[in-house]
Amino acid sequence: AYFEAMGLPGLKMLEELLPDMPKDIPVILDAKRGDIGETQKYYAQAYFDRMDVDAVTLNPFMGYDILEPFLDRPGKAVYLLAVTTNPGSVDVEQQVLANGRKVYQLVGDMVTRSIAENSATEVGMVVGLTNANSQILTDLPDAPLLVPGLGAQGGDLSALTGGTRVAPPTINVSRGILYKDPELSFAEKAEKWAKLIREALAL
């Protein structure tokens, strides 16, 4: 969104920036796209073919078919919005259905289905630290998690400790590195957060 806010010059900047990223560092595009299949097909081409990013976030609330154009890409990943960091997560994602399940568990079902169908693309979920808890993690399948909410949003890493999950989480810190502790370099701030994460998760 920050690139799109600048219009075409911003998108050009993004396109020029991506090739400069170190090849051993995965690039996750937080696009949160979710549209009908024909439109999603072109989003998949834009992100995985033209931009060649490693992973993208998707909004799954239109149904499983919005995933399908992204699922034939070996070496790529998608993360489905399950429990996001915003307060409004309780308005939809955490609502209880008539059968007692939560809406976010339907997202988990999509991940389970993609695994059962041997998707070439790895499929995981977005679970924000500000709303995460042991029950949510228990309710969701043991698949990779993209975990925002640490840093500026004040998420608590203890929400990820304990339990029996094996799939690795990818823990994101953005504004906590970009804008906090101006006396430190970006590298120093990144190392500081990496150390906190390692210590909290006993890595």
Located regions from the model:
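N-terminal active-site wall of soluble small-molecule enzyme domains
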Residues: 1-50, 131-135
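Conserved anion-binding
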Residues: 31, 35-126
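A C-terminal functional module that forms or caps the active site or interfaces directly
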Residues: 125, 129-172, 176-177
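Short beta-strand/loop segments at the ligand-binding rim of alpha/beta enzyme cores
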Residues: 22-32, 119-124, 141-147
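A general structural detector for well-ordered alpha-helical segments in enzyme core domains, enriched
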Residues: 10-17, 43, 47, 107-110, ...
